[in-house]
A protein has these predicted regions:
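Aromatic (often tryptophan-rich) hydrophobic motifs at membrane interfaces
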Residues: 90, 194-292
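A conserved beta-strand-loop-helix scaffold within acyl/acetyltransferase catalytic domains
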Residues: 2-50, 57-64, 106-112, 117-232
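Short, high-confidence coil segments that cap the C-terminus of an alpha-helix
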Residues: 41-43, 97-101, 195, 250-254
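The substrate-binding groove and active-site-proximal loops of carbohydrate-active enzymes
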Residues: 75-82
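Non-catalytic accessory segments adjacent to catalytic cores
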Residues: 85-118
Length: 297
């Protein structure tokens, strides 16, 4: 077992941190510093000697009580790098003692008896295929004259604000804080040259669908996307995501649909595009004082 130490945000060496994440067996973009800086401003960490292993602490405070929530647009954190089961247990014991409320998702390598959540992924080292329904939808979009275009980062930021922020608000019911986090994340990813945005346009050059993706060269996530032909069901979203999957093949090891709490329809959509289910743990521990629990109700 290697000793891990509590390190404040200003003391973290982001270069070493990111090297550990990228060299990890789970090189998840969620855990990179530019991503955490957007989704959990001021985050702290537990860090092993010479950054051998790292555990981000996405701390927040309310009513004078520190708690550990899962950040927006993030599906797996936990311990990364070269670690043992004892190291993981040390981290979990530490946060249980330090935080009264813990609601975090652990990456799939943190084998722990937590509640299970899932995402869908494509491992590019393995064969994958689109199902017949997906192929029909792609053909429908192509027959309608739809085509996919990659969007330059400056335009992508504008399109994200124009199309995706209203989608987050009106369709997903996310609050202004989450909408702000999303735009900070998009801008951070663009600055780091890790943002990829695609749009589907029709024969009149009208936007029919848009999707944003973030990739670190090993792990690619489908951040958010929406289409504007839901009633017509013209297949624009199938066309867009299938294009992205092919685009990142050879440029990434894994394509992650970035799930969590998935509806049956969304799970079916991901499966149809070749996604395989990947389970990971959700740690939910509530040791809040009784009067806070009563207030939360």
């Amino acid at each position: 077992m290697s000793k891990l130490f509590y390190i404040t945000h200003k003391e973290i060496d982001f270069v070493k941190w990111d090297q550990t994440i990228l060299n990890s067996k789970a090189p998840l973009v969620f855990a990179q510093s530019f991503y955490l800086n957007a989704t959990s401003a001021g985050w702290n960490a537990l860090i092993g000697e010479d950054y051998k292993s790292v555990f981000p602490l996405t701390t927040k405070s309310k009513f004078g009580i520190n708690y550990l929530p899962q950040p927006h647009f993030t599906s797996q954190l936990g311990l990364f790098g070269d670690f043992t089961k004892e190291d993981l247990n040390f981290c979990l014991d530490y946060i249980i003692k330090k935080y009264k409320l813990i609601q975090i998702e652990l990456n799939h390598l943190c084998n722990h008896s937590a509640t299970s959540k899932c995402t869908f992924v494509i491992d590019y080292k393995k064969p994958y295929s689109f199902n017949e329904n997906t192929k029909r939808n792609i053909s429908r979009a192509q027959n309608n004259g739809f085509k996919v275009e990659e969007v330059k980062d400056n335009d992508a930021i504008l399109l994200s604000q124009t199309y995706l922020v209203p989608f987050l608000k009106n369709d997903l019911g996310l609050n202004e804080e989450a909408q702000s986090v999303f735009m900070i994340l998009v801008k951070n990813a663009a600055k780091e040259k890790k943002l990829h945005t695609f749009k589907v346009i029709n024969t009149n050059e009208e936007v029919m669908a848009i999707g944003t993706f973030i990739s670190n060269g090993k792990h690619t996530i489908f951040l958010k996307g929406t289409n504007f032909d839901k009633k017509e069901n013209t297949g624009s979203m199938h066309l867009l995501v299938s294009h992205a999957i092919k685009y990142f093949e050879g440029k990434s090891e894994t394509f992650d649909f970035a799930g969590g709490s998935l509806s049956a329809g969304l799970a079916g959509f991901y499966k149809g595009l070749g996604g395989e289910q990947l389970n990971y743990g959700y740690l939910n521990i509530n040791n809040l004082p009784w009067y806070i629990k009563l207030f939360k109700k």
